[in-house]
Swiss-Prot record:
GO terms for cellular component: cytosol. This is Proline--tRNA ligase. The gene is proS. Belongs to the class-II aminoacyl-tRNA synthetase family. ProS type 1 subfamily. It comes from Marinomonas sp. (strain MWYL1). InterPro entries: aa-tRNA-synt_IIb, aa-tRNA-synth_II, aa-tRNA-synth_II/BPL/LPL, Anticodon-bd, Anticodon-bd_dom_sf, Pro-tRNA-ligase_IIa, Pro-tRNA-synth_IIa_bac-type, Pro-tRNA-Synthase_IIa_type1. Consists of three domains: the N-terminal catalytic domain, the editing domain and the C-terminal anticodon-binding domain. Catalyzes the attachment of proline to tRNA(Pro) in a two-step reaction: proline is first activated by ATP to form Pro-AMP and then transferred to the acceptor end of tRNA(Pro). As ProRS can inadvertently accommodate and process non-cognate amino acids such as alanine and cysteine, to avoid such errors it has two additional distinct editing activities against alanine. One activity is designated as 'pretransfer' editing and involves the tRNA(Pro)-independent hydrolysis of activated Ala-AMP. GO terms for molecular function: aminoacyl-tRNA deacylase activity; ATP binding; proline-tRNA ligase activity. The keyword Aminoacyl-tRNA synthetase applies. It catalyses: tRNA(Pro) + L-proline + ATP = L-prolyl-tRNA(Pro) + AMP + diphosphate. Pfam families: HGTP_anticodon, tRNA-synt_2b, tRNA_edit. It is an enzyme of class 6 (ligase). The keyword Flavoprotein does not apply.
Length: 574
């Protein structure tokens, strides 16, 4: 590509509304432009990177045995109503009507449509397993689209779906797709982790997320410093090595704690370490007769509640929701901020203590009396009726759940998610095949998603410096830039640039020949901003010496190379 025929929309300054690095650099490098909140046009440079990622994804899907299809972006409400997700999905599902009043949605995902295809086209066990994929635009009506293409309303995703006679076959394909995802991210050149994850609104019993490690990530991922264990913090089990509480050494004492509505203020007022306190939170629940009630969650003062874990407990209202203050006062006799476990069971409130809280002794907790707390509280002696469950987030230094090493927590950007869906969609949509005995069997399903457009941003978040983007070479918009000094004025420069351009292109490289009438500094700055890995500078002075100036984007120094060796030199660097 000759730069004189290319769209350079580079900017020296980042827009004020771009918060994360990837958004800033994608705007500055002329990769995207915003059309509306959460909606972007991809310009040539951005689309070149996008296509390279797309091609890697497509290649690995085909190697994994997946067949490419293309499904409609607009989906009929009837399919979503059959699975029950029309009501459950929430406002992220953009719903619309046609001129006849028929309801549709813009597809955020395609489980319903692909299962409709499978129930019509797959009739015999002999056709299974079958794996389909597509690379297509999705739409989710995000309440707060932000971070550029990282969390936009419209985005491109590769979604694949597999169909099986049984769970064993599903597991085999799941493992193949897991490996294919690792191959994708290895080929791109990202530092990533596959982690166990919650299945969320998609459903199913088993899933893994793939996270690119970056400080700007929205998710916390926990992994062992000594093994392969890795899980989303929502799913990582919090291990407590202590088996039971120590014997009491203090008497229970009621203490006046004015205006201490938080654990931090209570600990400061009483001059206690926060680890010797517990916090008690009341949430909405249902009793054994399915009637509304409240339940109490008790955690050590420095720990945070894990809503996903709590939602898996019997009797908890889903989605997780704290109890209303009026109900709290009616049930406990005090306002939030002074609530503790002592006496709650006697008031008919179910008490659930986290594992770490359940082995504490002589601790401080609310006295269920406004502006008062207890010190010297002990479970068996003072509040013996309680359950124990894992309801907190892991923290750094916790034992790894696999027994090897301790937990380290890093921020991650989710770029892929795979699920074992089981039979929930196939059952809802009556997708069956005949087995070897001629009996109808509900198919098992797997679902596998990769955020193609999101990978572009995630790669930048992991690869940049003060000058611009440091692309992994596999997805850089150009492999090499030939920067011409006075291309329009020097015949020698023009001849050598054209020769190099033709030879490097013939070797299969993606080449940018910068033949613009711009100052050298502008050309160099654009090369660095765009993250082009290799740069050759062709000028009259170098030609007189028989040399070209070479620079590798990720290194600081320039070096002179012989003109005769230039093509082979560049190929050796690839």
């Amino acid at each position: 590509m000759r730069a004189s025929n290319y769209l350079f929309s580079t900017l020296r300054d980042a827009p004020t509304d771009a918060v994360v690095t990837s958004h800033q650099l994608m705007i500055r490098a002329g990769m995207i432009r915003q059309v509306s909140k959460g909606l972007y046009t991809w310009l040539p440079t951005g689309l070149k990177v996008f296509r390279k990622i797309e091609n890697i994804v497509r290649d690995e899907m085909e190697k994994a045995g997946s067949l490419e299809v293309m499904m409609p972006g607009v989906q009929p409400a009837e399919l979503w109503q059959e699975t029950g997700r029309w009501q459950k999905y929430g406002p992220e599902l953009l719903r619309l009507q046609d001129r006849h009043g028929r309801e549709y949605c813009l597809g955020p995902t395609h489980e319903e449509v692909i299962t409709e295809l499978a129930r019509n086209e797959l009739t015999s066990y002999k056709q299974l397993p079958m794996n389909f994929f597509q690379i297509q635009t999705k739409f989710r009506d995000e309440v707060r689209p932000r971070f550029g293409v990282m969390r936009s309303r419209e985005f491109c995703m590769k979604d694949a779906y597999s169909f099986h006679v049984g769970a064993e076959s599903l597991q085999e394909t799941y493992d193949i797709m897991h490996k294919a995802y690792c191959n994708v991210f290895d080929r791109i050149g990202l530092n990533y982790r596959p982690v166990r994850a919650d299945t969320g609104s998609i459903g199913g019993a088993y899933s893994h997320e793939f996270h690119v490690l970056a400080d700007s990530g929205e998710d916390d991922i926990a992994f062992s410093d000594s093994s392969d264990f890795a899980a989303n913090i929502e799913l990582a089990e919090a291990i407590c090595l202590k088996e039971k509480a120590d014997a009491p050494t203090q008497d229970i004492t009621e203490v006046f704690t004015p205006d201490c509505k938080t654990i931090a203020k209570v600990a400061e007022f009483l001059k206690l370490d926060v680890t010797s306190t517990v916090k008690t939170m009341l949430i909405k629940a249902v009793d054994e007769n399915d009637q509304p009630t409240i339940a109490a969650l008790v955690l050590r003062g420095d720990h945070n509640i894990n809503e996903i874990k709590v939602e898996k407990l019997a009797g908890v209202v889903i989605p997780f929701e704290f109890a209303d203050e009026a109900d709290i006062i009616a049930k406990t006799g005090c306002a939030p901020g002074s609530i503790g476990p002592k006496g709650l069971a006697e008031k008919g409130i179910r008490v659930i203590a986290d594992r770490s809280a359940a082995v504490m002794s002589d601790f401080c907790a609310g006295a269920n009396k406004d502006d008062y707390h207890f010190t010297g509280l002990n479970w068996e002696r003072d509040c013996a009726e309680f359950e124990v469950a894992d309801i907190r987030n892991v923290v750094e230094g916790d034992p790894s759940p696999d027994g090897q090493g301790t937990i380290v927590i890093k921020r991650g950007i989710e770029v892929g998610h795979i699920f074992q869906l089981g039979q929930q969609y196939a059952e809802a949509l009556k997708a069956t095949v005949l087995d070897e005995n001629g009996k109808a069997q509900v198919m098992h399903m797997g679902c596998y998603g990769i955020g193609v457009s999101r990978i572009v941003a995630a790669a930048i978040e992991q690869n940049f410096d003060e000058k611009g983007i440091l692309w992994p070479e596999s997805i850089a918009p150009f492999d090499i830039a030939i920067v011409a000094m006075n291309y329009d004025k020097s015949e020698a420069v023009r001849t050598e640039c054209d020769r190099l351009y033709a030879e490097l292109k013939a070797k299969g490289l993606d080449v940018l020949l910068d033949d613009r009438k711009e100052r050298p500094g502008v050309k160099f700055a654009d090369c660095e901003l765009l993250g082009i890995p290799h740069r050759l500078v062709v000028g009259d002075k170098g030609l007189e010496k028989g040399t070209l100036e070479y620079k590798y984007r990720k290194a600081g120094d320039n070096e002179d190379i012989a003109i005769a060796d230039a093509v082979e030199f560049i190929l050796s660097k690839k």
